[in-house]
Curated annotation (Swiss-Prot):
Family: Belongs to the SpvA family.
Pfam families for the chain: VRP1
Chain segments annotated as coiled-coil in the UniProt record: none
Protein name: 28.1 kDa virulence protein
Gene behind this protein: spvA
Origin: domain of life: Bacteria
Keyword terms of this UniProt record: Plasmid, Virulence
NCBIfam families, per the entry: PRK15212.1 (NF011759)
InterPro entries in alphabetical order: Insecticidal_toxin/plasmid_vir (IPR018003), Sal_SpvA (IPR003518)
Biological function: Not known. This protein is involved in the virulence of salmonellas.
């Protein structure tokens, strides 16, 4: 800059704030607030003790505030120009979009008809329900910890147990061999009960079967022919107009 340059508006505000004559900074080669903040606060005060005196610190603080504001405005304008330039490259405002698929859109009332009956309570909002049931938290944590490794829990146990494996011969069956197979299955304890629970679907009296699996004491499947009853006992939501096959093949246990 040269002496013919005028003081910037931001620096003029600093002059007004500290009550010095207009253009006084320019006499000392300060034409903008950036000329001031190029120096540290201490350097500026020491270099200008003769004329602003005790107001030098306040002048530097005001100049720093103005400089920060100008930087923010400059960056904001840059970002605005970039966004506008990007939008101009995609001038389509939606008028060219096809409306042929609008008729096939399912509204929220169809997708979640149960929303209208839900209560806004703490359990409904904050209760965490696993997406895969039955769920076992400790087993899930172990599986997650081994997710990015090349070894399974069975492999880790086999390397650390001196009597592994227990199921090499028929004579080594028992609790230990069952434990080994449980580890190898990679199923949680709740999942392991599904294939090992007693089969109660082949009895002559199926009351116990329906009581255990569908929560209704009945000797046959006829109560579940009513869709509302079937959906309620399974805790499922049926969309409006939906149907569930509740004939013999759906509700009667396979023999």
């Amino acid at each position: 800059m040269n002496m013919n340059q005028t003081t910037s508006p931001a620096l003029s505000q600093v002059e007004t704030a500290i009550r010095v004559p207009a253009g006084n900074f320019a006499k000392y080669n300060y034409y903008s607030v950036f000329d001031i903040v190029r120096q540290t606060r201490k350097q500026f005060i020491n270099a200008n003790m003769s004329w602003p005196g005790s107001r030098g610190g306040k002048a530097w603080d005001l100049a720093m505030g103005q400089a920060q504001y100008i930087r923010c405005m400059f960056r904001e304008n840059q970002l605005t120009r970039r966004v506008r330039g990007t939008l101009q490259q995609t001038p389509d405002n939606g008028t060219n979009l096809s409306s042929s698929a609008v008729g096939g859109i399912q509204g929220q009332a169809e997708r979640r008809p149960d929303l209208a009956t839900l209560m806004v309570v703490n359990d409904a909002i904050n209760q965490q329900i696993p997406t895969l049931l039955p769920y076992h938290f400790p087993h899930d944590q172990v599986e997650l910890s081994l997710l990015n490794t090349d070894v399974s829990l069975e492999d880790i146990i086999s390397e650390s147990s001196i009597d592994w494996p227990w199921f090499l011969s028929n004579s080594l069956t028992g609790d230990n061999s069952n434990y080994a197979m449980e580890l190898a299955s990679r199923l949680s304890p709740e999942q392991q009960t599904l294939p090992t629970e007693p089969d109660n679907s082949t009895a002559t009296d199926l009351t116990s079967f329906y009581q255990t699996n569908l929560g209704l004491k009945t000797a046959d499947y006829t109560p579940f022919e009513a869709l509302n009853t079937f959906a309620r006992q399974l805790a499922i939501t049926v969309p409006p107009g939906g149907t569930v096959d509740c004939g013999y093949s759906a509700c009667q246990p396979a023999v």
